[in-house]
Curated annotation (Swiss-Prot):
This is Carbohydrate sulfotransferase 6. The chain crosses the membrane at residues 6-26. Residues 27-395 are lumenal. Pfam families: Sulfotransfer_1. 3'-phosphoadenylyl sulfate binds at residues 49-55, 202-210. The gene is CHST6. Belongs to the sulfotransferase 1 family. Gal/GlcNAc/GalNAc subfamily. GO terms for biological process: carbohydrate metabolic process; keratan sulfate proteoglycan biosynthetic process; N-acetylglucosamine metabolic process; sulfur compound metabolic process. Residues 1-5 are cytoplasmic. Its EC number is 2.8.2.21. One of its GO terms (molecular function) is N-acetylglucosamine 6-O-sulfotransferase activity. Coiled coil: none annotated. Changing residue 211 to W: In MCD; abolishes the ability to sulfate keratan. Keywords: Carbohydrate metabolism, Corneal dystrophy, Disease variant, Glycoprotein, Golgi apparatus, Membrane, Signal-anchor, Transferase, Transmembrane, Transmembrane helix.
Length: 395
């Protein structure tokens, strides 16, 4: 068999090229660390629409150590709106990974015209984008206000988002566009990330009541959830979207608690909105401890203010975090929904109610009786609420 002859000079050149390539790859800087040299912590607030996720996002956002973005994957879904939630999972995951690493070039595919911070979805709710080095509307450690930030920072360069992101010890993203946990496994096992998942759930009956108040705003997302190939869905009399949301919460919680992979240990925590509403400071301290943050006196005062307002909040504030009575918000559905609709939600979401610890009601009298507690104690049926304390449910 004839073999081509290769000169020793060519072999030497090839070996040198490989050596230089290896040295280049090894010497490339990895993801930047915040000041102090400690590894950056990445937190994903994983939830669904109308579940209190904007509120929980703000609990992280207002912390002085946090760079926060609200639903960056909104750009994926609005650009690729003819896709389905399942087909867009990988694009959403890849964008989330890039943002966690402060690589804002990932938005090129969705914002080719990007010039200013205001090109980002809900940019002004991010305290980090309203304070140095991104903007000077607020001192870095101050509680920010969207209304004040918008006119002052809208024309700031988009490139400042990366600079700001790299200056914080924690990057927190709130997302409502993941419908199973498995799609996140590559992020959880990625050595470049130090990921924690906060899985926020809410009583499906309360979710339905809130969704009905914001039906128009959710129409495009509903179509993607239902896989309608780009058709918006405002009216959903069959409650198909609510059913899919319930199923997704069950899939995620079961994947995290029944037989979780080793890389998930200590990285997942399930939180019920109702528990936050009842004991906000205790729950928030636990959340902060889980993610390596501490509660400051300034934050404690702010949290007390936004959870002890009057009433459930106006409809125009549906997508905003304002001062409200958190307990009233969590119970409002019991007065607002007809019993027939509640019974239907309970049928469609029976598995979620049982797994997540919500008691069904069997009559209108039970529905209206606020003395009847419908939020069951945590740990019912051996449910593991944080995989940092246990990796398997008890039998």
């Amino acid at each position: 068999m004839w073999l081509p002859r290769v000169s020793s000079t060519a072999v030497t050149a090839l070996l040198l090229a490989q050596t230089f390539l290896l040295l280049f790859l090894v010497s490339r800087p990895g993801p930047s660390s915040p000041a102090g040299g400690e590894a950056r912590v990445h937190v994903l607030v994983l939830s669904s629409w109308r579940s209190g996720s904007s509120f929980v996002g703000q609990l992280f956002n207002q912390h002085p150590d946090v760079f926060y973005l609200m639903e960056p994957a909104w750009h994926v879904w609005t650009t690729l709106s003819q896709g389905s939630a399942a087909t867009l999972h990988m694009a959403v995951r890849d964008l989330v990974r890039s943002v966690f690493l402060c690589d804002m070039d990932v938005f090129d595919a969705y914002l080719p015209w990007r010039r200013n911070l205001s090109d980002l979805f809900q940019w002004a709710v991010s305290r980090a984008l309203c304070s140095p080095p991104a903007c000077s509307a607020f001192p870095r450690g101050a509680i920010s206000s969207e209304a004040v930030c918008k006119p002052l920072c809208a024309r700031q360069s988009f490139t400042l988002a990366r600079e700001a992101c790299r200056s914080y010890s924690h990057v927190v993203l709130k997302e409502v566009r993941f419908f199973n946990l498995q799609v996140l496994y590559p992020l959880l096992s990625d050595p470049a990330l130090n990921l924690r998942i906060v899985h926020l759930v809410r009583d499906p009956r309360a979710v339905l009541r809130s969704r009905e108040q914001t039906a128009k705003a959710l129409a495009r997302d509903n179509g993607i959830v239902l896989g309608t190939n780009g058709t918006w869905v405002e009216a959903d009399p069959g409650l198909r979207v609510v059913r899919e949301v319930c199923r997704s919460h069950v899939r995620i919680a079961e994947a995290a608690t029944l037989k979780p992979p080793p890389f998930l240990r200590g990285r997942y925590r399930l939180v019920r909105f109702e528990d936050l509403a009842r004991e906000p400071l205790a729950e928030i301290r636990a959340l902060y401890a889980f993610t390596g943050l501490s509660l400051t006196p300034q934050l404690e005062a702010w949290i007390h203010n936004i959870t002890h307002g009057s009433g459930p909040g106006a409809r125009r504030e549906a997508f905003k975090t304002s001062s409200r009575n958190a307990l009233n918000v969590s119970q409002a559905w019991r007065h607002a929904l007809p019993f027939a609709k509640i019974r239907r939600v309970q049928e469609l979401c029976a598995g979620a109610l049982q797994l997540l610890g919500y008691r069904p009601v069997y009559s209108e009298d039970e529905q209206r009786n606020l003395a009847l507690d419908l939020v069951l104690p945590r740990g019912l049926n051996g449910f593991t609420w944080a995989s940092s304390t246990a990796s398997h449910p008890r039998n």
